[in-house]
Curated annotation (Swiss-Prot):
Gene Ontology MF terms: manganese ion binding; metalloaminopeptidase activity
EC number: 3.4.11.1, 3.4.11.10
Gene3D superfamilies in alphabetical order: Leucine Aminopeptidase, subunit E, domain 1, Zn peptidases
Protein name: Probable cytosol aminopeptidase
Homology family: Belongs to the peptidase M17 family.
Source organism of the structure: Micrococcus luteus (strain ATCC 4698 / DSM 20030 / JCM 1464 / CCM 169 / CCUG 5858 / IAM 1056 / NBRC 3333 / NCIMB 9278 / NCTC 2665 / VKM Ac-2230)
UniProt-listed InterPro entries: Leucine_aapep/pepB, Macro_dom-like, Peptidase_M17_C, Peptidase_M17_leu_NH2_pept, Peptidase_M17_N
Presence of the UniProt keyword Transport in the record: no
Subcellular location field: Cytoplasm
Single GO biological process annotation from the record: proteolysis
A GO CC term assigned to this protein in UniProt: cytoplasm
Cofactor(s) listed: Mn(2+)
One Pfam family matching this protein: Peptidase_M17_N
Length: 510
């Protein structure tokens, strides 16, 4: 389920390249396209610029042109990658470089080794180019037949990546190592989300996590259905009871001895969502294998934090269930007793993600972390409010803003949203403590309001510890790309928010 065959990533001088293709950047300046590299010999650069008009080069985002190698450049193929508009100083943004690297590498599938001479003269720029290249070198073929995989071998992702940079090895190597680790984490999420629900369900998801982390310092603890029942995880059990594949709760932990802080992460892991008795229309189920993207993200972030040896304790909680209709499934009007004791009236069985997440939020905050962030493909309302590329971020103001800032630094799109107090009234139940469904309008924020009720909900009343800061990331839109690939983002699973959360955790170490 999780592919371990990722591309290698090294820094090279131009004269030492072994690649068969070299990527250079072209931006859009006020007077036309601008070549963005100092690595090429002057004659080669002049010849390239002279070809722009003939080739129709504009330097637009995702624009890729190929042409034969030039004298003084030790590769047989040159690739011009558009980075889009430049700033007032004639520079491309880090995200533009990341996107250009990804688009170029993605277009070169079938090429064994690719070098990139995009601007990489600072650690931030080098990181952007390296990350984009790694993320662009992705394909999911694990469930094709051997024959089909062999036929597709000519278009397999790039296996070797070389980045041309003037930085010394002491400065470049740590940047490239981080890019490789974070890129691998993003691609691990893509692998899991792209896996068919016939193969990935709660038990196999838990097994895949345990197997992947077996040789790492990350500890893994799995609750099966018997342990969940014995310990009172009523929400996870209720959502999973309609399926012949029982639910799981997985706790993973990176616990360095010198931890500067403790961050808890909670991920929604509905391995397939039919809607349950409140059945979805057939067309709405077509992407519902991706409803576990939040749990996959949490797994990948903890994995990356451990691989990078970040001095922050990180606990990840993966709430795994399959939401199916059957004679044993929960019904609208059922009442669930949750972990921690709160009761929930089920008004709609298709509002199931918040129920499994609530159990996990209680468990996570019982451990008194310094902050808890949850990640979920939670609501269709997120797409209505923010579209398919922005993550909605809600919660306590300071942590919400910290998450949005981390997303901005990582080059991911996120938008902070309010949680008005009046939304709580729409979740009132006449028979239980709270309903799992509120009013139609503001559905993304109402779902987050439901989750907020379970932060610290399992603590005894005499526990006078400060309330745990909490933020909620709704990735329903950006977690799965149903449109054409762009930049470093492929079709289908994207791995969104891994880079954001790794950056946020690293920030806590500082």
């Amino acid at each position: 389920m999780i592919t371990l065959d990722r591309p290698t990533l090294t820094a090279r001088a131009l004269e030492d390249l072994t690649a068969s293709a070299l990527v250079v950047g072209v931006g859009t300046g006020p007077d036309g396209p601008v070549l963005l590299t100092d690595a090429l010999p002057a004659e080669a650069a002049t010849a390239l610029e002279a070809s722009f008009e003939l080739l129709g080069v504009r330097g637009a985002e995702d624009e890729v042109h190929r042409l034969p190698g030039l004298g003084g450049v030790p590769v047989p193929l040159l690739v011009l990658a558009g980075v889009g508009g430049l700033d007032d100083d004639g520079e491309a943004s880090d995200e533009s470089l990341r996107r250009a690297a990804g688009a170029a590498v993605r277009s070169l599938a079938g090429t064994d080794a690719v070098a990139l001479a995009l601007p990489a003269d600072t650690p931030a720029r080098l990181a952007a180019v390296a990350e984009g290249a790694v993320l662009g070198a992705y394909a999911f073929t694990a469930q094709k037949s051997e024959c089909a995989r062999a036929e597709a071998d000519s278009s397999r992702p790039v296996r070797e990546l070389e980045v041309v940079t003037p930085l010394a090895a002491a400065d470049a190597d740590p940047v490239l190592r981080r890019a490789a680790v974070v890129g691998d984490a993003v691609c691990a999420v893509r692998d899991l989300v792209n896996t068919a629900p016939s193969h990935l369900y709660p038990a196999t998801f838990a097994d895949a996590v345990a197997e992947d982390l077996a040789d790492s310092p990350v500890s893994v603890d799995v609750w099966d259905e018997d342990r969940l029942r014995a310990e009172g995880f009523g929400g996870i059990l209720a959502i999973g009871q309609g399926s012949s594949r029982p639910p799981r709760l997985v706790r993973i932990e990176h616990a360095p001895a010198d931890a500067a802080a403790h961050i808890a992460l909670v991920g929604k892991g509905i391995t397939f969502d039919t809607g349950g008795i409140s059945l979805k229309p057939a067309a709405s189920m077509m992407t519902m294998k991706s409803d576990m993207a939040g749990a996959a993200t949490v797994f990948a972030v903890v994995r990356a934090a451990a691989a990078l040896d970040v001095p922050v304790k990180v606990t990840g909680w993966l709430a795994l269930a399959e939401n199916m209709p059957s004679g044993t499934a929960i019904r609208p009007s059922d009442v669930i007793t949750m972990y921690g004791g709160k009761t929930v009236e089920v008004m709609n069985t298709d509002a199931e993600g918040r129920v499994v997440m609530a159990d996990a939020l209680v468990a996570a905050t019982n451990e008194h972390p310094d902050a808890v962030l949850d990640v979920a493909t939670l609501t269709g309302a997120q797409l209505v409010a923010l579209g398919v590329r922005h993550t909605g971020v809600m919660g306590d103001d300071a942590l919400r803003d910290e998450a949005v800032a981390a997303a901005d630094a990582a080059g991911e799109l996120a938008w902070g949203m309010p949680l008005p107090e009046q939304l709580r009234a729409s979740l009132t139940s006449r028979v239980a403590d709270i309903s799992n469904m509120g009013d139609r309008f503001g559905g993304m924020m109402t779902a987050a309001t439901f989750l907020r009720e379970f932060v610290d909900a399992g603590r005894p009343q005499d526990d006078d510890a400060a309330r745990t800061p909490w933020a909620h990331l709704d990735i329903a839109g950006p977690s799965f790309n149903e449109s054409a690939a762009y930049g470093y983002t492929p079709q289908d699973a994207t791995g969104v928010m891994v880079r954001t959360l790794v950056g946020l955790i690293e920030g806590r170490a500082r």
